[in-house]
């Protein structure tokens, strides 16, 4: 009886409270739309530091070349279609009119070969053909052989797939002389096709001078499996949570992939999440169509929220096109455009149409730029930029909607996001990772579009999206040490320490909610890997500033740190 009276009283109170009060009762991480970030896998840079270059056999000088001397009057270079004669002049200008050795002539041929190689023409070389040279004044002729790919040999099992491979071969063989950038682009585009992985080699043509044959081998992987278990959830939805996904690669032989994801809290009534991704490569140049959809629902499980019968449901759909403007081993640039649709709902006491229950329906577009580059020092840089704009219409809720997740949040929003990172090896197994995230909005945002601090990347000592804001700056620094070992089945033993910091700002906060947040954390951990299939991340984290610390009281305008709390996290990931 008393419980029933209490529930009625609480319900009556909740109907009359403001959005500010709801924001304090329901943490941002447990509001609809925020659960998606838990199950999004961060983009991995495609760029890799340059490997060993393709090299053509050098031209060895004959015995006695270092002792044979001549006066060099002029150099004549024949067979070059890439460069004008004047572009070679700097390579031998200091030799003209001087007494030089025959070895110097062969060294000049090597410099010409190196010039071709530096510009990507790795199959081309300069030769010293047989000729009569006057020791008292010689005109030396150098013959350039500009190498090219005469033929690409693809495995016969590719004949059952949509034929992009003839296009790749045509692009590669049409270029004379062959440039490694062209060869690399089309082999990498082939390797981006779902479920197909390639190895290649080059062999000389049996009859044609300067010609080569590109031989390609393929490995087909029809299914990818992924699983993760961790304790990075929240008290209301976790903290133990899981994620599984299965990808069907190219089953229709039309260069498509379908991924189905099932995830949630261990107590699935608190949070259940379904996701699906379909993508298809439409052209041999890598133009790709994609559709991503997700559906999450649950009843967060703290005593307070259970008493209020708080429930959430969120749906998200996006569809668009992406195109690899640059696809190379050491640098990549991909541009995407998409339309998105979202429907995020929460309810108290099964009263979805009565405040403080919430309803956000958003429609809009995003433009994404994803770039990465590796440099000669071994560092890998990554850039991720997103421009998002929402529309009022097309089925969205209206601005000023009494059920909006934030009183002044707008559906016709505009925001930009930028993520930068660099991983730099320092030698001796030591490396450092630096990352920064920035979001800027010009109007107040609804909850699902706000930036969050807290989770696996930034704010690691905090729950996912422990803080949210319209505008954010977040920084991360991580020092790593790879431990050498002799275990063949161990792919990684790595110690690391990190520190991160976040500054968040809310535009037009309602009374009782935070305008500015300043939070930070630090920690250390151990990463282990087995056979590149299983990895374990164990870490201790300490929140050194921000809400979430024992004794902290959130007040408008600031967050004051008290006694720091320490947390232990684990992440176990497997893939096949």
Please describe what each predicted stretch is:
Residues 210, 238-242, 270-274, 313-317, ...:
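Residues that define the transmembrane beta-barrel architecture of outer-membrane proteins
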Residues 246, 528, 560-576:
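Outer-membrane beta-barrel "beta-signal"
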Residues 345-513, 549-561, 572-575:
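C-terminal outer-membrane beta-barrel translocator/porin domains of Gram-negative envelope proteins
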Residues 269-373:
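Transmembrane beta-barrel wall of Gram-negative outer-membrane proteins
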Residues 248-250, 280-282, 323-325, 371-375, ...:
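Residue-level signature of outer-membrane beta-barrel architecture
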